[in-house]
Design a protein with these regions (language model features):
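Membrane-interface loop-to-helix entry segments
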Residues: 107-109
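Acidic/histidine-rich catalytic neighborhood of metal-dependent amide-processing enzymes
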Residues: 111-163
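Acidic/His- and Gly-rich active-site-bordering loop/insert found
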Residues: 2-105, 114-117, 121-131
Length: 163
């Protein structure tokens, strides 16, 4: 990554900090356990609906692939985040605590997803400066074996990815 591009990307990410927090809190309030992330997957796909990218379902689970500059020659880089919650009761009084009894985000997948959504948005904004393509991988069911990754890999999530 050249220093100028990196600086622009970091500035954009800084400019979107409040959006990252808002997305993370929404996701934290609406966790779903592995292989039942239907609403989360819909939320993720809806986020991309007005952005200049190609979105598709991936795997026989709720996996999502987002391609930026899919036909541009050069390396294909990938970023990945998981988005399932855990079957744990959240016991606190935070204004954004889980609204789903017995399910919570206890290990950061809400944050991973929020950050990846905004990273993708910023990369789309800078897409003309990218020498190649970007693949964004939203993986469900990371908390159980074999999880959603295997299904996504079999359905081509990593096909053509260089790094």
């Amino acid at each position: 990554m050249n220093p100028s591009f990196e600086s622009k990307l970091m500035t954009l990410l800084d400019d979107h900090q409040s959006e990252i927090i808002e997305l993370r809190r929404y996701l934290h309030e609406h966790p779903e356990v592995s292989f039942h992330e239907k609403n989360t997957a819909t939320f993720i796909k809806d986020y991309y609906s007005n952005l200049d990218c190609k979105v598709r379902d991936c795997g026989d689970c709720y996996g999502i692939i987002v391609d930026i500059n899919p036909d541009k020659p050069g390396k294909k880089l990938a970023w990945r985040a998981d988005f399932d919650g855990l079957a744990i009761q959240e016991d606190n009084d935070l204004p954004f605590k889980s609204q789903n009894p017995g399910v919570m985000h206890a290990c950061g997948h809400d944050g991973h997803t929020a950050y990846l959504l905004v990273l993708a948005k910023c990369l789309i904004e800078l897409k003309d400066e990218i020498n190649g393509s970007i693949r964004i991988i939203h993986q469900p069911a990371e908390e159980v074996a074999p999880g959603g990754a295997l299904s996504m890999i079999k359905d081509g999530a990593l096909d053509g990815v260089d790094d």
